[in-house]
Amino acid sequence: MNKITIIGTGSVGATIAYTLNTMGIASEIVLIDINTEKALGEALDIRQGNSFFGGNCSIYAGDYCDAAGSNIVILTSGIARKPGQTRLELAQTNVNITKSILPQITKYAPNAIYIIVSNPVDILTYVFFKQSGLPANHIIGSGTVLDTSRLRARLSEYYNINQTNVHAYVFGEHGDSSFVPWSVANISGVPIKDCPQLITTPGMISPALDFAEIETYVKKSGGRVIARKGATFYAVSAAGCHICKCLH
C-alpha cells in the first residue's frame, strides 16, 4: 500500500496525479483543493481511464481528514507564475497559503513524507519545516530536481544523445541563483570537457560547450515555457513523481 495525497489540483497537481497513476507507484491517491468541484472533476477524469493502466489505484477527491494514513503528501497549492514574473514575487502570497494549509494537513498526516513543489519552493519548504515542527527528514522540497532535468535535456539535445546517458546536476536554490558543478558532469562516464572530441556527428565536429550559455538557458527555461503556453506543469510534475518513485 502506498497512499499519496496531493494538495492543489491545478495543472501541476492534476498532472502529478495522472502521472503517478500511469507509473503504478500509488495504490491510493487523494486530491484536495479549495475548489472541491475541480478536485472531483480531476479525480473522475483520471479514474475513468484507469482500466488502461491496470486499474489498481483508487483515486478520489477528499478533505484533509481523508489524508489520514498517507505515506506521502505533495503540496502544489498556490498561485502560479505569470509571464515575466519571478518565483520570488510569489513568495508572500504562497507563504500565507502554505501556512493556512499546514495545520490542517499535519493534523491528519503527521507521519507522512511531505514534498513541497509550489514556488518559491526553497522558501516554502523552509517555512513548512519551521512552522510544522515535523522532523527535517520528513520534508523535501523539489529543489533543483527540475533544473537538473532541464540541464540534462539541453545537453542531450546539444550532443544528440539519450538523456539517460547525461550525468550532470544543478545545485543551489531552484531558479536564477542555481549553479552547475561542471567538474562532476559527464556523459556515460566521459568528463563533459572531453566530450567535444569524443562525441561527434559524421561530417561535423562538436564545438566546446559554452557553460555560461547552458546555465542561462536552464535558468530561463521556465520563463520560456510560460511565455509560450502560459504555465509549466509537465516537467515539474515529472520531477515530483520522480521523488515519489525514489521514496517508494
Per-segment meaning from a language model:
Residues G13-A14:
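N-terminal Rossmann-fold NAD(P) dinucleotide-binding loop
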Residues T9-G10:
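Glycine-rich Rossmann-fold phosphate-binding loop(s) that bind the pyrophosphate
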Residues M1-I4:
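Extreme N-terminal starter segment of soluble prokaryotic enzymes
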Residues I32-N71, Q85:
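Conserved N-terminal Rossmann-fold NAD(P) cofactor-binding segment
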Residues T86-R152:
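Rossmann-like NAD(P)(H) cofactor-binding subdomain of soluble oxidoreductases
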Residues S132-H138, T148-H248:
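C-terminal substrate-binding/catalytic lobe of Rossmann-fold NAD(P)-dependent dehydrogenases
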Residues S77-I79:
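Conserved NAD(P)H cofactor-binding loop of Rossmann-fold oxidoreductase domains
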